[in-house]
């Protein structure tokens, strides 16, 4: 039948040198080969990409390697593989399997403290670990968005430079909820994140962005309880955010965090307010950059850096840059600026 052929074609398309999909389950072509973290993590990447769970036989092989890794931790490029899992469409399925087989605890040992942890209130529908996976799933499901308000969030997601950082922040934003009750969960999550981000092998800038997202993950929700049409409220929020990229990630983190609490948590009214706050903050960030001008006396460092690359420009460089919007300086390299100075000199005939 044509349906049988479609299934056969899908199996052939998704199968690789290492993995085969049979009856909708992932099998290892060479089970004995799964002895190192590399193939182990690629197994979860395969699940995250194709949405097929592991066959029972595969689970047994994986569990054995995970057990050995838990007993004897190894130095490994965990972030390279974890980031690849997080950005794939079925990341949440892969993460659930990783948790079930103990792999998530190998990478983030503190995750075991939120395993099946229930919050005793009427608001949270899911355990903390499942809320985390749902939040990651929520962002990925934006790819299927049809409603106009959801499409706007999807477009922001598609603009992200490094979506893996957003997903890592979501993975770790509530990990501190398993800490003693006398410590605020954000503080506990930050302590854990600081240690884990370094162990995962993130760069200093990546660590800073993920840490900031975890630290501020309740901020947008807090601002929504104020007057979001008040310019001073928006300006104070914008100052804390700092960059358009962080604003985009915080918007999506907040959207996913609220939506993954329970099926009715993100009402259309709340989603609209969240979007309005984002637009106001984005406009404020753009205005701030346009209003901010370069002055040689207050920023001599930049002048020196460009002069090192193009000493022939002399005083023309200072004249050209004086009063330029800071946005221009952030968009162009020193080489491009030097070329623009030369072009302006030709146009002006000097």
Residue ranges of predicted features:
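Short, hydrophobic/amphipathic alpha-helical patches that form generic packing surfaces
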Residues: 37-50, 84, 97-100, 137, ...
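Non-catalytic interface/linker regions that flank or bridge core catalytic/transmembrane domains
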Residues: 1-122
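Flexible, glycine/threonine-enriched loop-and-boundary segments that flank and lead into catalytic domains
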Residues: 117-121, 144-159, 194-195, 231-237, ...
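Short coil/turn segments at secondary-structure boundaries
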Residues: 1-3, 54-62, 74-79, 93-102, ...
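Short helix-capping/linker segments at secondary-structure and domain boundaries
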Residues: 47-57, 105-106, 143-147, 176-180, ...
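Regulatory modules associated with amino-acid/nitrogen control
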Residues: 1-25, 233-350
């Amino acid at each position: 039948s044509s349906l049988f052929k479609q299934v056969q074609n899908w199996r052939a398309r998704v199968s690789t040198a290492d993995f085969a999909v049979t009856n909708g389950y992932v099998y290892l072509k060479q089970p004995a080969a799964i002895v190192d973290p590399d193939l182990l993590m690629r197994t979860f990447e395969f699940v995250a990409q194709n949405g097929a769970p592991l066959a029972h036989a595969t689970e047994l092989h994986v569990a054995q390697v995970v057990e050995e890794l838990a007993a004897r931790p190894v130095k490994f490029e965990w972030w390279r593989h974890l980031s690849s899992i997080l950005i794939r469409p079925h990341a949440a399925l892969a993460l659930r399997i990783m948790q079930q087989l103990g792999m998530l605890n190998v990478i983030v040992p503190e995750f075991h403290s939120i395993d099946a942890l229930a919050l005793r209130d009427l608001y949270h529908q899911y355990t903390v670990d499942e809320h985390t996976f749902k939040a990651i799933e929520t962002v990925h499901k934006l790819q299927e968005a049809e409603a106009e308000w959801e499409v706007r969030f999807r477009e922001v997601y598609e603009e992200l430079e490094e979506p893996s950082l957003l997903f890592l922040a979501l993975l770790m934003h509530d990990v501190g909820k398993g800490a003693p009750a006398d410590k605020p969960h954000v503080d506990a999550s930050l302590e854990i994140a600081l240690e884990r981000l370094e162990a995962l092998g993130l760069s200093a800038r990546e660590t800073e962005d993920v840490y900031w997202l975890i630290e501020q993950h309740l901020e947008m929700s807090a601002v929504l309880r104020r007057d979001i049409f008040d310019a001073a409220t928006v300006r104070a929020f914008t100052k804390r955010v700092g960059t358009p990229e962080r604003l985009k990630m915080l918007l999506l983190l907040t959207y996913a965090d609220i939506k993954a609490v329970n099926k009715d948590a993100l009402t259309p009214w709340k989603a609209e307010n969240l979007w309005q706050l984002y637009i106001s903050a984005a406009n404020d960030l753009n205005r701030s950059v346009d209003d901010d001008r370069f002055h040689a006396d207050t920023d001599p460092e930049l002048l020196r850096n460009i002069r090192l690359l193009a000493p022939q420009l002399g005083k023309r460089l200072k004249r050209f840059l004086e009063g330029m919007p800071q946005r221009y300086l952030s968009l162009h390299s020193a080489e491009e600026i030097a070329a623009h100075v030369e072009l302006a000199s030709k146009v002006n005939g000097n």
